[in-house]
């Protein structure tokens, strides 16, 4: 990957080094915004956006620094209340907002920063990105969520959070404590979306309907992926509608929300949507 560097950043909150992949802007001499781009549930050591998400193609001519923290598997990019025996110590919100951002913006590190930040993600990363933007509106100028779930208190959001954590051997109570605790409520953007009022917001979801495009993509993949992807995307559709409606109820109409008929939860879907999503938030970062 050209223009992609791997930085190792010491995290006091997580008490370990964290590897962060950074895609440099096309023109390193010109000031550029920083776009924090969060991964899906796997959270591997190489960002899925690079492996499967078409990132290099979309940003080949763009003047933006893309920041991809790695190794956040099943974390929801949040601060956990307890260390987890399977997953370890997770303090992702603190790491991104209090440790990583100030570090990257120091002039001596050579990233020419224009003062604007965006945060974005897909699936689990969308949950983390939209929460982080809502909780830290002073930090972000734009947020983008592809196929995420933004309530933690409703039945779908609660179940998605639980399934994500347990799928990697974690205990959901180590994340936010017992269901209904202050931390569960803190992460529920649908009940308090006020932090999104003064930033550009782009949300996208398909509806889980299987079309020919999905059948073609899944030809060489196991059938359960298609079935699970359909169910998941039906869920994220309901979740996205819920946030859109909550924002409207709070008097916000600036959000750009795209509902696509046809499409299941897969990298093929996210890859196809990334160019549109980026163009939607780009003006607020330049």
Feature-to-residue mapping (PLM):
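Non-catalytic cap/lid and distal C-terminal segments of serine-dependent acyl enzymes
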Residues: 1-286
